Amino acid sequence: MKALVENLKATARETDATDIRAAFAADPNRFSRFSTALDDLLFDYSKCAVNDRIIDGLEALAKAAKVEEKRDAMFRGDIINITEERAVLHTALRNRSNRPVLVDGKNVVPDVNAVLEAMGRFADHVRSGDLKGATGKKITDVVNIGIGGSDLGPVMATLALAPFHDGPRLHFVSNVDGAHIADTLKLLDAETSLFIVASKTFTTIETMTNAATARAFIAGKLGEAAVGHHFAAVSTALDKVGAFGINAARVFGFWDWVGGRYSIWSAIGLPLMIAIGKENFGRFLDGGHSMDEHFRAAPLRQNIPVLLGLIGFYNRNVLGYPSRAILPYDQRLTRFPAYLQQLDMESNGKGVTLESQPVEFSTGPVVWGEPGTNGQHAFYQLIHQGTDIIPAEFMIAAKGHEKDLRHQHQLLIANCLAQSEALMKGRTLAEAKAQLTSKGMDEAKADKIAPHRVFTGNRPSLTIVYDQLDPFALGRLIALYEHRVFVEGALFNINSFDQWGVELGKELATGLLPVVEGRESAEGHDSSTTGLVAALLKAAR
C-alpha cells in the first residue's frame, strides 16, 4: 500500500494532476469522462485533481486494500468490528429485498421487519390521535431525548424532510446543559407531550439526566401515575426502562450490530417515522437500499461510494489536504454537515490498524461545513484564497419544494455551480488588473490592489446532483456517505465501527463530578484541572 501511495504521488507530480484548469482546457470531454450516475443521482468529480493515470492508481489501491472483499464481508454479516467482536449490519435494517442476513447462523431480517412493523403501528397511533396522554388529549408534541447517534440522525433527517411532515411537532434534546431541556419544556403542554428516551443501555448519562428532568416535568404537572402515558423508549434494557415507568409495549429495541452513528435506519428513527409517516419512512429505507445494491454490484470505476472514498483518501494522503468542506445547497440539510462530521470523524478518527499497529497513513480528515449560500458569506473566503487547500463537496437538487419560489431555487443553483467553477478557474493577476482598470482605476493603484483580488484556482471540488430532496433521495445520500466512510476505513486498514476515543473523557468526568460538586478534594488531578475547579467553585458561590 505504501508503495502504491508513493507511486500516486509521483504520478500526480509527473502529470500535473493538480492543474485542474489546464485539464479542462485540454479535454472538452472531461466532464463526461469523470462523472457517473445512479438513476437521477449524478456524481461529478471532474473538478477533482485526477486524471486517467490517477484513477488507474486508485483502482489498484482499492484492490490492494481488498475493498471489495471487505465490503462483501460486511454485507455477509462477518465480524468486522474486531475490537467489540460484532457484525456491522446497518444495511440489514434497510434490506428491502428481504434477502436473508445471518448473524451467528440466524436470519435477522424477520426480527428487523417485526420491529419496523411495531414502530409503524405506534407511529400511526400517535399521528392519528388514537394514542392519548393521561388526561385524554391527543399528542401534539414529541420530544426525542438522546445524544450522538441517537440524536444527530433523527434531528438531521427530520429537518431535511420538513415538506413531508404531517404529524405532530418534533423537538430534540441532547445536551446535558440544563438550558437545552429547560428551553424545550417551556414550549410544551404536559398533557399533549410525548417523550422518547433513546438509549440502548438506558445508562447514557446525558440522556438519562435529561430524561429524569422530563419525567419530573410530567409527574409534577400531571402526577406520578401519568408518567407511563407520556413516555416511550428506544432501548434494549427492559428492566431499567420498566423501573423508569415505561410499559414494555412502548419499548423498541435494536441490536449490537447497529452502531449509534448508523442507527437512523433502526428504531432510533422512530421520531422521524412519527413526523413523516411509515410510508415515507419506507421510501427513506428504499433509498438507502438502492445505494447498498449499487455499492455491492457496480464496477469500481462506476461505483459512486468507492470513487468518493478513493478521492477522499487521495486528497488526504497523496495531496496532503487535512480537511474537507461539506456544502449542501439546501437549507433543510442544515445539520447534514454535522451528521457527516460524526459519521466520518468518529468512524475514521483512528490511529491503530486492524493488526493493532500504528497506522502508516493520515486517517480521517476534519469534516465540517454549512449550507450554501450562507457559507459564502462566512468561510468561503478561506476556501478561495486561504493558504490551505480544502476540497469542497457540493450537493444540489434540481428542484425545490416551493413551486412559487422557483426563481429562488434557480438563484441557489447558479450560486452552487458558480462556486465550484470559481474554485477551479480562479482569477489571474492579469485578469484582476484588467478588471480594475476597465472600471477606471489608474495603473499604479491597480498594481497595488490586483494581488488582493487574485484567486489561485485549481482548488478541487466535487458535486452531487439529484432531482429533489425527498425521503428516497435522503436515504440514498446518507447511505452513499456511509459507504464512502467504509471505503476510506478499508484503505486506512482500521476498524471504522468502534469509538474508544469517546470513553476516556467520560470516565474522567465521572470521577470529577464529586469534585465539582464540592464533595471531594481535587487532590491527584493536574494543576490546571485543580485550578479550574477552584475558580469555578468560587464563582458559583
Curated annotation (Swiss-Prot):
Its main location: cytoplasm. Pfam families: PGI. It is found in: Cytoplasm. Coiled coil: none annotated. Keywords: Cytoplasm, Gluconeogenesis, Glycolysis, Isomerase. GO terms for cellular component: cytosol. It comes from the Bacteria. Pathway: Carbohydrate biosynthesis; gluconeogenesis; Carbohydrate degradation; glycolysis; D-glyceraldehyde 3-phosphate and glycerone phosphate from D-glucose: step 2/4. GO terms for molecular function: carbohydrate derivative binding; glucose-6-phosphate isomerase activity; monosaccharide binding. Its EC number is 5.3.1.9. It catalyses: alpha-D-glucose 6-phosphate = beta-D-fructose 6-phosphate. GO terms for biological process: gluconeogenesis; glucose 6-phosphate metabolic process; glycolytic process. The active site is at 346 (proton donor), 377, 506. The keyword Cytoplasm applies. The keyword tRNA-binding does not apply. Belongs to the GPI family. NCBIfam families: PRK00179.1. HAMAP family: G6P_isomerase (MF_00473). This is Glucose-6-phosphate isomerase. The gene is pgi.
